[in-house]
Amino acid sequence: MENNVLPEYVSGIPTAKNRSRERMDLIRYYYSNLWKRLQREGKTNKIFNDYLGVDVYVAENESDKKTINTASKNWQSTYAVKHLYDIVINAAGDENQPVYVSVKTGTQTYNGYKNMAILYYDFVNIERDYLNFRAKLTIGVKANDKHVQYCVNKIEVKEKKPTVQSNYP
């Protein structure tokens, strides 16, 4: 199999666009497993993010709701949810983007966030091209400075066009 041929399943996740319902179920399963893991480790549903230097809470019925709807749309986002523990630990800001942004109206305001932190995590795999993508981790920051994982999803990265030097003045 070639490096750029997308298989029907990646790490147990269906890759076909029309399989979002199955991916929703997998995301629920991944969150359930993550909460169980955090409880076993005595972390009370929180994971320390090295970049921000804060605990990020993975709150049941808050962290999972937005992600279930958003991440089920494509397999890479579901793959990111499967690796959420590592993403929360290692996600960092992008030097070309502000880390903290204003909340949007709707769910972000309803959840009581005063602002949002946007971090990124790059999946890199030298053997399989389709496993090279960027995930965006959105964290809601409450008035008491509690950081809550809001959403994780795959994002499209627009490549910068190379600058072509010109001989003209």
Description of each model-found segment:
Residues 1-169:
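Ribonuclease/tRNase effector modules and their secretory precursors
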